[in-house]
Structures are given as C-alpha cells and as structure tokens.
Regions:
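Rossmann-like dinucleotide/flavin-binding elements
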Residues: 3-54, 92-104, 108-149
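Short, well-ordered helical secondary-structure segments
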Residues: 7, 61-63, 70, 87-89, ...
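A conserved short coil-to-beta-strand element within the FAD-binding core of flavoproteins
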Residues: 76-87, 112
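N-terminal glycine-rich dinucleotide-binding loop that anchors FAD/FMN and/or NAD(P) in oxidoreductases
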Residues: 4, 55-81, 147-149
Length: 149
C-alpha cells in the first residue's frame, strides 16, 4: 500500500488500483487513474463520496456522475480490513466481508496537520500544517496571514 502523496509524486501503480478513501483526494486520484486507462476501485467508509465541507458542489457532483457513467466501482459504507497480495478484504456496514482483486492500493484516508515548528511571534501557519483543507482554504489562509504582517 502506498500513500496518496507517493502516487502524486510519481510512484507507479498497477492496472487495477484500490483507492482507500473517497474524499476529494481519493476521488481525484481515481479520476486521474481512469483518464490514463487504469481501473480504479473506490472504498469509502462514509455513505457518500466527497462528503467534506468546502468542496464546490459542481465539482463533487460531476465526479459522482462521471464515476457512475464510466462504471467505476464505488463501495460506500465499506471499511478496509486487510491488504493481501493481489487483493484487499473489506467489510460493509452489516459486517459482510468482500474480497476485491487489485494490483495496487493507494491510501487516501486522510491526513492530520503536522507543523514542522512551534508557534512563535511573527510565525503564521498556513496550508495543511494548520488544518488540512483544499486549494481555496490555503489561498484564503495565506491571504489572511499576509494581511497580519
């Protein structure tokens, strides 16, 4: 299993790729993989894809509809139990296990902010080291920090 950051940094994956986490990152990676001819499979614990706040409704709706149109397998209310060689084992909300064959697994299950330094005078945290967000929240945070300087 590799992290989303590793994939985005260029790490190769197989033909059929299980994506653990159907938030914005996982959904965008699935979209990119499908556009390049790979076969993504999304596994999401929540009852919907891209359920976090602050995401443009047009973007999230487009991705949901595109996955349905392209018949991208999406397992909602499903959690990862085990990663095996050539497959993953998941459980749905009733506890029923399902084995999903795949060549690679990408973890997109979320991140925790991790500043590289402590808060000091004239130090402003922006971006994911303050709070994991999206491009809009990063730009707004940087603007607000710049206005304080």
């Amino acid at each position: 299993m590799i992290e989303a950051c590793d994939f985005l940094g260029g790490q190769e994956v197989g033909e059929t790729v299980a994506i653990i986490g159907g938030g914005l990152t996982g959904s965008e990676i699935a979209y990119e993989l499908a556009l390049t001819g790979k076969k993504p499979i999304i596994v999401e614990m929540k009852d919907d894809l891209i359920s976090q706040t602050g995401v443009c409704l047009a973007n999230s709706s487009y991705l949901r509809e595109w996955f349905a149109l392209k018949k991208i397998p999406v397992y909602l209310e499903t959690s990862l139990k085990e990663v095996k060689d050539g497959s993953i084992v998941c459980a749905d909300k009733s506890g029923k296990e399902v084995c999903i064959e795949c060549d690679s697994v990408i973890s997109c299950a979320g991140y925790v902010p991790a500043p590289l330094t402590e808060k000091r005078t004239n130090t402003y945290f922006v971006g994911d080291c303050k709070k994991v967000g999206n491009l809009r929240s990063v730009i707004w945070g940087a603007y607000e920090a710049a206005m304080k300087i």
